[in-house]
Every structure is written in C-alpha cells, then in structure tokens.
C-alpha cells in the first residue's frame, strides 16, 4: 500500500530562546502509515498504553539535518529582521492609536460633567457599550475645543509654541534613545540618548548608522529635527517681532527717567509748546542753571505709535535741545502714568484732544484723577488746559496734586489782538525767553520796604506788582510794605535768581520828611495836569470814553466758544453795534448765543444768524452787501469789520487745512469788498502757521492774521517751567482782570514834551496803570533801559500798559 508521511512539526523559536532550544531534547515526531497487518494492532500487555510503530519510506536521510538547515537560513533572512524590527514601532503605534481613541471620550466626559444640563442629552437609555463610544460630532467638537484652548493660550503667550516644541523634541529624543538601547546591547542608555539627540540636531548623523532599523530611526529623528528647528526659528522670530512691537508701542514699557516733562495729548498747541521748551532749555544751558544738555520730553497719547514717531522725528529736526520720547497708551489709566514715571517728572502738561468743551473738561478731569493714586505727586506741577474757569475749583479739589488749570483763552486773545494793533507782538515778546519775560523772585533783604521804593529803585527791570499768598496784585498802594513771604513780579530778561540781588537799587531809601512829602505832592499835581484822567467806570476796553465805538461785524465760521468772542466784542463796542454770524452750522447748534443774549450778558451787540458756506463767493457777497446796506440810510458812519475763525475740530485734527480755509476766506472777502467798493475797517483771521500768515501779509498788508493758538501754547509752556506764573497769566487773560493795552500816548503827555520812561510810568501809575514799554515809530520797546533818559515820542506813538477795565481814580493830593 502507498504510505502517507506526516512531516516534522517544530514550533517557532525566537533568537532570544535559541540557547534554551539547544539545551532541550528534540521532540521531532514522524508518523508513517502503512498497510495494516492482518492481525491488526497488538496491544501491550500493560493496560491503558499501546505502542505505535512507524516506518519511513523513500528517503532514508535523518530528518534532523533538514530542519536545522531550514532554521538557520530563516533566522538570517531579511524578512525576519524586518519583522523583528517593526515589532517595537508597531507597539508604539498601537499605544498612540489607543490614546487617540480614548482622548475624545475623556474630553467628552469632562465637558459633559461641566455642563449644568448634560443630563438632558442622556434621556434615552442606551447600552453601556454604545454610551462609551463617542459620536463623530463629539470627537470633532472635542478636537475643536482642544485647538481653541491651545490657540487661546497662544494668543495670551506666544511662548506656548516654544514650550510645546521643546516637549515634543525631548520626547522624540527619549523614544529614539530607547529604540537604540533596545538593539544595542553593548551601548549604554546615555550614549543611546546622545545618539538620538545627534540625529535630531544633525541630519547627517543618521547616515552613519549601520543597520537598516537604526537608519530608519535616525531618518525619522532627522526629519523631525528639520521640522523642529524650522518651527523653532519661526517661533523665535515671531516672539522677537512681538516683543519689538511692544517696545515700539511703549504701552507696557517702564520709563526710567527723572526730571523729564510729560505732555499728554496731541493738538495744534504741541509744536509751539515744544518751541517754547526748546528755547527755555537753550537759555538754561547758556546760564548754567541745568546740567543736562537736552531736556527729556515724553509724549503720551492714545494715537498709534507710528503716527507719534513720525511727529517726533519731524520735531526732532527743529528742536535740537529736546530729546523726545513717545508712548502710546490710555491717558485715563493710573498704570500709564506709573509707567511714565510721573512721580519723577519735572512737570506734566495735559492738552485737550476733543472739540467739544464738555469732552475737553471731562477728559482733563479723568487724566488728573488718574494721577491721584500715585505717591509723591505733591510737588509735581500738573498744567491742565481747560475750556472754562469753572473747572478751576474742581481740579484744585483733588488732594495730593499740584494742579495748575490754564483756561483756553484763544477766543478772547483773538478779539483783543484784532481790536488792538501790535498787541499780538507784545504777547510774543513777553513769552519769548530770549527777550523780556515775567519773573517772580523773593528779596528777603528788602523785607519791610515800601512798594514805591521798589518801583523807583530797580533800574534794570519794570516792577509790575507783588505775589502774596498765591494771588497777584498789579496795583499795590505805594505805602504797602514788602513781606518776607512775598515775591516781586517784574519784567526783565531771563537770568539766574541770585543775579537779581546785584541790581542797582537807587532811591531805595527815601527819608519821610516834610520836604520830601511836599516834593511828592508837587510832582503829583504837575503830572495830573499833563494826563487825561480815567473815568470812574469805563464802558469800553478800547476807549476811555463812556461808550465804545459803534460797529458792524461779520463773523465767518463757527465753533463752540463763539459766545466768548461775542462777549469780548461786547466789552469793546458801544451800544447799537451789530454782529452777524455766517456759517453752514444749523441754527439749532447755535442756541448758546441766544441764551447768553437772553440772560443779559451781551448788552451792546445785536446778534443775527445766516446759514451758508462762507467759502462760497455768492453767499459771502450777499452777506457783505447785507451788512453794508444795513446802516446805509443812517446818518452815522458805521465801521465794518470782517473776522474769520477756524473750526475747532480742524484745529485739533488738521491745522494746516484750517489755515488754508481761513486764508482763502479772508482773501475772498477782501476781493469782494474791493469789487463792491465797500470800505472795511479791519480784516482779520485766525491762523496757526505764522509763516503762512507772514507770507500773505507781505502781499496783502491790509490783512491781519492772528496766531492766538500760538500765544496760548506759549503761556502753557511758560507755566510748565514756572507754575507760579499761572496766576499772572490767569489775571491778564481773564476778561474781568488786568489786561495788556496799547493806548495812545496823548493820554500821558502833552505835545512837545520829551519825558523819560520813569516819568511816563509815574503818570501811568496815577491812572492806576503799570507802564511796561512803548511803541515808537511802529517799533515796540519793552523794559527800556536806561529809564531816566528823555524819550522823544510823537503823538501817533503808544504806551504799553497793564490796566483794569474798571479802575477808579484813587490818587488824591
């Protein structure tokens, strides 16, 4: 019979079990089936056991030899090595797959546990296995939630990517090192980790690996190293860019400066303030009163940093004595001023940035309120520009601060300078540090001396008054004695304080004898005969008569403080005057003027309104003809005045555009008047750029451009350098206080006289006025030296005085 042979079966033995295999006996079995004998199988004599006898047919070669050759070839083959090498990677992939499968479930459970109505989604009873398997929607939501949390953290801190990259990098190094350690029995774990790090940082290292599996691990590490370093480089670049952006914005940077000046806000006053501070620094360096070559100035605003840097670069070219720093931040936060080192500043200037007067005062109050929590602010002067004097008491009430409110009096200045020729030049002179300016100085060695002795004693200055208890008095009595705490107010060039003690003090001591009293009496009597005494109550600022001139005024433009302009015009003009406002602003927005008229604050002027564009030729022509025909039938000769004002929003946002519109309107008005043959007494306009105004006046001498914004800015800057001067300028710019006037010389002398400036000062004092200079031949001279020499003046010349609107004649013989 044909026999069927069952070949040898042998279990698979791993290489690690090879030694054990060699030590054990072989369990090879062979079974051959032959034809059975007729007698069948013989049973053994022992119960329960039997023997099977096998017989091989065919090949008689021993079976163990073939099996050994097969095993040796199998262990050395390439498939075997690949299978063995992939087993660890397969294990890692399975673990990662397990984690990936379990992660959505964990996220889902955590989210459901945090939701107050999570139980509502589990209303239908499900199989526990189905409950454990998350839906695809939950998986997507969980992944989106994880990505959202990561991006949120990334927005807060860009360094999150850097941390994640480092963790992933070291994880790959550890895993790769463990793989190397698995297949390198003769290498320590430390060397394997270092080898993995070398493959990560140097892509050429994986080429040095000997086995394919090690090369595969090195290749993976090299690829990840390239990805890691590219991402790391981009992250570091972005982090550096973000840091530089914060540095450029300056919002979170701490200023480490001292004795610097902080300016909050940007408007049309800023360039003039910088000009004044630059001039003051030049004189301080020249006099040796400062050790710093440049004055550090910090410009703070809520505008973007790029715009501020452009302004700073433009200003740096013109003001070489200033070192301008910029900081973009909120002006209503205490943290902003703390980072600006406000407690170490020399002064703080807060400028308005809004057109509405209420917004100006509100922003100013909030900025000052933000300074209140900062310590050591009692000695730091804070100069705040406000729209009205009503804010004085409110700002002064904030404890712990030295607040100096400065009222924005550009409207009053514009009217004053338009009514009095050369007054704008006098203001500029008194605010120019290279010329004569207001000074306040203590003289302890002169304590007890009478004010008359002080007036006549100083020959190099013009004594203007006394500052006592924070209040300035321009008209003390001659018998008033100087107290130790008083400060003398005078006009002189800017000098060191100690130099004033070296001035000549002639006539300081006057003997109070009968002869001297008689001499003084005779001098007063002689002077009173040569002057025109003031009335007991003046009704006009521009004239000593009982009523001002009657005029017709055409006001072109509109802004919120027009009411102040009308009030100032009302104090210069006489009864029966008229004022018409032409603007494209609706009548509903002009109710403030009507309310002032209704309350009786405007007495001499009748106000009317017209709606139209004052830059339109036909509209402006119609308004001028209407003003001309209004008094044509009357017998009186009514003078016509045309004034142009700038829009407040344009002054704050684009001053150059405001100047262009004002200049064009004034030139258009002059052209129309010339064509119609209308005689205009005064053509005046506001302007910010004084260079443009001078350029136009060279071509058109009949036009007047008044830089009231510049004067107000110079006042603010001067108060920042000496806060005590705020009371001086407050009184001068106040409509109800003392003001600077340019008065005809015929009020103080007779024709043919040649009095000295000292004599003119004494005659002005009899009129309760303070003479500070004169205008001779169109040239102004303030604080003339010497004062005792005769001055040849014509009757067309003028005397510059500081006077009150209502000054009673108190001089008695």
Curated annotation (Swiss-Prot):
Pfam families: Castor_Poll_mid. The chain crosses the membrane at residues 161-181, 216-236. It comes from the Eukaryota. GO terms for biological process: potassium ion transport. Keywords: Membrane, Transmembrane, Transmembrane helix. It is found in: Membrane. The keyword Repeat does not apply. It is a multi-pass membrane protein. GO terms for cellular component: chloroplast; chloroplast envelope; plastid membrane. This is Putative ion channel POLLUX-like 1. It comes from Arabidopsis thaliana.
């Amino acid at each position: 019979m044909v026999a069927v042979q069952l070949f040898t079966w042998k279990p698979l033995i791993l290489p690690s079990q090879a030694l054990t295999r060699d030590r054990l006996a072989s369990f090879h079995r062979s079974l051959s089936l032959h034809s059975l004998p007729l007698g069948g199988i013989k049973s053994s004599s022992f119960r329960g056991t039997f023997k099977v006898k096998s017989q091989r047919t065919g090949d008689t070669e021993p079976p163990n030899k073939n099996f050994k050759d097969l095993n040796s070839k199998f262990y050395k083959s390439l498939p075997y090595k690949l299978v063995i090498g992939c087993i660890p990677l397969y294990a890692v992939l399975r673990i990662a797959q397990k984690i990936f499968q379990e992660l959505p479930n964990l996220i889902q459970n955590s989210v459901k546990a945090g939701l107050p109505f999570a139980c509502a989604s589990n209303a239908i009873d499900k199989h526990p296995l189905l409950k454990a398997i998350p839906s695809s929607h939950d998986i997507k939501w969980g992944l989106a939630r994880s990505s959202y949390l990561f991006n949120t953290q990334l927005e807060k801190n860009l360094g999150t990517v850097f941390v994640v990259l480092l963790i992933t990098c070291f994880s790959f190094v550890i895993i790769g090192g463990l793989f190397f350690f698995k297949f390198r029995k003769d290498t320590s774990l430390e060397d394997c980790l270092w080898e993995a790090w070398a493959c990560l940082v140097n892509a050429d290292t994986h080429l040095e690996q000997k086995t394919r599996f090690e090369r595969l691990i090195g290749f993976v590490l090299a690829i990840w190293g390239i990805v890691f370093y590219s991402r790391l480089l981009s992250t570091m670049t972005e982090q550096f860019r973000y840091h530089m952006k914060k540095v450029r914005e300056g919002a979170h940077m701490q200023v480490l400066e001292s004795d610097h000046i902080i300016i909050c806000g940007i408007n049309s006053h800023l360039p003039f303030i910088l000009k004044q501070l630059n001039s003051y620094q030049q004189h301080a360096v020249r006099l040796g009163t400062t050790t710093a070559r440049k004055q550090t100035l910090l410009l703070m605003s809520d505008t973007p940093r790029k715009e501020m840097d452009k302004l700073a670069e433009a200003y740096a070219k013109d003001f070489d004595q200033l070192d301008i720093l910029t900081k973009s931040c909120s002006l209503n936060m205490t943290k902003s001023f703390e980072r600006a080192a406000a407690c170490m500043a020399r002064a703080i200037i807060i400028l308005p940035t809004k057109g509405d007067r209420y917004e100006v005062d509100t922003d100013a109050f909030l900025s000052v309120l933000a300074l209140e929590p900062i310590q050591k602010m009692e000695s730091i002067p804070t100069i705040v520009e406000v729209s009205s004097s009503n804010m004085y008491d409110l700002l002064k009430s904030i404890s712990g601060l030295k607040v100096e409110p400065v009222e924005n009096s550009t409207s009053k200045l514009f009217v004053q300078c338009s009514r009095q020729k050369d007054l704008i030049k006098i203001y500029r002179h008194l605010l120019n540090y290279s010329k004569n300016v207001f000074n306040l100085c203590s003289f302890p060695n002169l304590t007890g001396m009478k004010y008359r002795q002080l007036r006549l004693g100083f020959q190099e200055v013009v004594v203007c008054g006394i500052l006592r208890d924070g209040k300035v008095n321009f008209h003390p009595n001659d018998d008033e004695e100087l107290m130790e705490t008083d400060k003398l107010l005078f006009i002189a060039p800017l000098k060191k304080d100690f130099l004033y003690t070296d001035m000549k003090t002639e006539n300081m001591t006057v003997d109070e004898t009968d002869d001297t009293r008689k001499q003084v009496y005779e001098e007063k009597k002689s002077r009173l005969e040569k002057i025109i005494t003031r009335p007991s109550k003046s009704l006009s600022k521009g004239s000593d008569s009982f009523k001002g001139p009657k005029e017709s005024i055409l006001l072109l433009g509109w802004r919120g403080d027009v009411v102040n302009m009308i009030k100032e015009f009302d104090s210069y003009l006489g009864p029966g005057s008229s004022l018409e406002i032409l603007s494209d602003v609706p009548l509903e927005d002009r109710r403030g003027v009507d309310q002032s008229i209704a309350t009786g604050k405007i007495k001499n002027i009748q106000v009317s309104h017209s709606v139209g564009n004052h830059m339109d030729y036909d509209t402006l022509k119609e308004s001028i003809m209407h003003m001309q025909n209004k008094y044509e039938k009357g017998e009186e000769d009514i003078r016509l005045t045309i004034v142009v004002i700038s829009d407040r929003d344009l002054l704050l946002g684009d001053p150059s555009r405001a100047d262009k519109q004002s200049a064009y309107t004034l030139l258009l008005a002059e052209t129309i008047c010339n064509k119609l043959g209308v005689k205009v007494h005064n053509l005046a306009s506001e302007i910010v750029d004084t260079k443009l105004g001078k350029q136009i006046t060279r071509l058109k001498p009949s036009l007047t451009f008044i830089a009231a914004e510049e004067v107000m800015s110079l006042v603010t800057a001067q108060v920042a350098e000496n806060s005590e001067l705020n009371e001086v300028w407050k009184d001068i710019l106040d409509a109800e206080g003392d003001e600077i006037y340019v008065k005809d010389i015929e009020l103080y002398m007779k024709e043919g006289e040649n009095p000295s400036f000292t004599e003119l000062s004494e005659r002005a004092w009899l009129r309760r006025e303070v003479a500070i200079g004169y205008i001779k031949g169109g040239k102004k001279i303030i604080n003339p030296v010497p004062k005792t020499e005769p001055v040849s003046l014509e009757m067309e010349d003028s005397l510059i005085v500081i006077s009150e609107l209502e000054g009673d004649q108190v001089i008695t013989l």
